Structure formats: structure tokens, C-alpha cells
Amino acid sequence: MGTLWLSAVAIEEVRAIFGAPEPEAEALRALAAEHFGPPARRQPGMLGKLGPVFRRPADAPVIRPDTPVREDCDRLLRGEHIPPHRLAASWRLLQVWIAARAWSTHTATVDEHALNAIEFDLARAGVPARHSVRALMVRDLETGMFPAAGMAAGYCTGDQAVAAAASWAAVRDELEPANAEWIGDLLGWLGEFPQWTTSAAGRRRQPPDLVCLLTA
């Protein structure tokens, strides 16, 4: 089962993570360590076979491929190219950093088949394509990082998110029960967008956009 992960945060605040200056970068490193443990460096490939000095200790913890390590953290903070085999781990790390800057996040469980059914139901009820669920991620994040395998990433403005929510709310009673429930949960969260926008102005922050990650 896949997930739709949404974050109410200004896109410029997301882009600012890449190439972040100190001490901001140090704060992000600390946040990474808090979530994933101290960012230990990966064992060099061939050096591990050269002898006891370079060999990985037998009791060393096994690091999953999608678990961020120090190199992932450093690459993101320097705005460097992310190798394809480190994209999954790097996106996990980026999500933690985005969530720390966001006004709120929301996660909805959905797979491709279910999302297609929701989109069809919305269209049948008269919701225009520009207000479809996938239209929430119509804009490129422009971070320079490609999506991981099985992932789609993008964003829309806060105004676009609010407009889409209004379109969904108007036809919710016409949707199939399961689709209406799924949309209803999302509407409850999106309904807070005007308040977050007001709060951002009061704190001299940029108004939140809607950053979206869809995983298969």
C-alpha cells in the first residue's frame, strides 16, 4: 500500500535546505542524528576485505539501504548530486527536515488503483482536472533531486490547495462512501490552510505551499 505525504510549507523553505549555511546546516545535522542515530560513515567497499583494521565489527548494526548516513546528509546540505542508490534514504531524510519546517503534515494511505478510483469519482462529480488529487503535485520542487523509484514529488501553491479542497467539499456527498471518507480526512487537514497562512504572515514567514510526495 502506498502513501500520499503532504506538508504545508513554503517551497522556498524547502529549497533553502540544499546548500544551507552554518549554523543552520548544523541544526539539520542534529535533527538527522535525533531521528536516525548518529550519522556514522558507510564502510568503504573493498577496504573491508583488507584485514582486521578495516573489517566491519561482527556486532556492528546492519544499516538498511533506505536509512540515511552521514554522506547522505552532507550531500543534501551541500546541494550535491544524489546517486540513484541513495535516493530512497535521502528522501527519508529530506522528509524529516521538511516536517520540521512545516506548519503541519498529513499522511494518507492510498495505492495506485485506489487513487485512480478517487480521481475518477471526483471527475464524474464535476471536479475539474486542475483540482484533481494529482494536480496538487503539478509543479516541480526544483531541488535538483530526482524522485526515488516508485515515487512522485511536486507541489502547488496554498491558494491552489484551498481551491481544490473547496471543489472536493462541494461534491463530497456524491462520491462513493470509501472515496468520500478518504477525501473527508484530507479536507479536515486542508481546512487549516487559511490559519497557517495567517500565522506565517504574523511571523514574517513565507505563506505555506503544499508539498506532496506520492509513493507506490
Residues of each region from the PLM?
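Intrinsically disordered, Lys/Arg-rich low-complexity segments
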Residues: L210
